[in-house]
């Protein structure tokens, strides 16, 4: 009877040790590779309207005169070019609608989940993120959202520029969240956004101050009550529609 050739115990132990070392370094290696993919961003150039990886905001004509917290926003590529959903089936590229940005907030790319495959998620959502649509890079997320919104109808109350930015942030799973919507995007920018300069502040609030003053002088205090009611109704609509009737809001 011939004996089968066995594998020496020393070789088995050595192979297990090698496998353990491979497993122990594989995850950090992936993370380091992902961080290496995030090349340095160019500097923000307000004069040329280049805001790398920023959310940008500008006041809307007439609407912002009555409710200055409402404005038009866009999201910028890594090279600083602004993309914004400005009308039905239309995404502006490097031509921000309604004037130059007045406020901006630069986002941190390291807070994005950019999985190379199903097993590469750094967020808690995994399959849900994949099903919604993931991105390998920041610009890839913007390109995917652009293709999606090129087939959507613009509506200031249900599907607007904030919806486009929220869609991009959900593809990026920014901050570990896929719950971005037009309300929390607006609040994020309102709380953490930076004014570009003093003239941006004036441009954003002076028309509202003038309209309010003229209204009080010509109509009286009822105008102020009506203006406050208008702002409150707008705010209530976006809150209720976003969190209570999710099928209405894009």
UniProtKB/Swiss-Prot annotation:
Tissues expressed in: Strongly expressed in 1-4-day-old seedlings in the apical hook, cotyledons, root vascular tissue, root tip and root hairs, with little or no expression in the hypocotyl. In light-grown seedlings, expression could also be seen in the apex and young leaves, and disappeared from the cotyledons by 10 days. In mature plants, expressed in floral buds, the style of mature flowers, stems and the rachis.
Membrane topology qualifier: Multi-pass membrane protein
Quaternary state and interactors: Interacts with ETR1 through a region corresponding to its ethylene-binding domain.
Keywords carried by this UniProt record: Endoplasmic reticulum, Golgi apparatus, Membrane, Transmembrane, Transmembrane helix
Location of this chain's protein in the cell: Endoplasmic reticulum membrane; Golgi apparatus membrane
Up-regulation conditions: By ethylene.
Gene this chain is encoded by: RTE1
Disruption phenotype annotation: Enhanced ethylene sensitivity.
Gene Ontology CC annotation, any one: Golgi membrane
Source species: Arabidopsis thaliana (Mouse-ear cress)
Highest taxon, organism lineage: Eukaryota
Keyword set includes Membrane: yes
Transmembrane segments: 55-75, 200-220, 221-241
Keyword Transmembrane helix: yes
GO biological process: one example: negative regulation of ethylene-activated signaling pathway
Official protein name in the record: Protein REVERSION-TO-ETHYLENE SENSITIVITY1
Function as written in the Swiss-Prot or TrEMBL entry: Acts at an early step in the ethylene signaling pathway. Positively regulates ETR1, leading to the negative regulation of ethylene responses.
């Amino acid at each position: 009877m011939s004996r089968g050739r066995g594998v020496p115990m020393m070789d088995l132990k050595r192979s297990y040790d090698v496998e353990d070392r491979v497993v122990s370094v594989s995850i950090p290696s992936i993370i380091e590779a992902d961080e290496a993919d995030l090349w340095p961003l160019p500097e923000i150039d307000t004069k040329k309207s280049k805001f790398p990886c920023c959310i940008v905001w500008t006041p809307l004509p007439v609407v912002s005169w009555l409710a200055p917290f409402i404005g038009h926003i866009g999201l910028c590529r890594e090279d600083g070019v602004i993309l914004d959903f400005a009308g039905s089936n239309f995404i502006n590229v490097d031509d921000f609608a309604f004037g130059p940005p007045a406020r901006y907030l630069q986002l941190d790319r390291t807070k994005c989940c950019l999985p190379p495959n199903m097993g590469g998620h750094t967020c808690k959502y995994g399959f849900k993120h994949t099903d919604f649509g993931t991105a390998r890079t920041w610009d890839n997320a913007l390109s995917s959202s652009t293709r999606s919104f090129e087939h959507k109808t613009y509506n200031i109350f249900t599907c607007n520029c904030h919806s486009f930015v929220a869609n991009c942030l959900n593809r990026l799973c920014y901050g570990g969240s896929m719950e971005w919507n037009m309300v929390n995007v607006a609040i994020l920018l309102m709380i953490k956004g930076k004014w570009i300069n003093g003239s941006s502040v004036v441009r954003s609030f002076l028309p509202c101050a003038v309209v309010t003053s003229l209204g009080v002088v010509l109509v009286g205090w009822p105008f102020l009550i009506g203006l406050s009611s208008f702002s409150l109704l707008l705010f209530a609509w976006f809150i209720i529609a976003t969190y209570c009737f999710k099928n209405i809001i894009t």
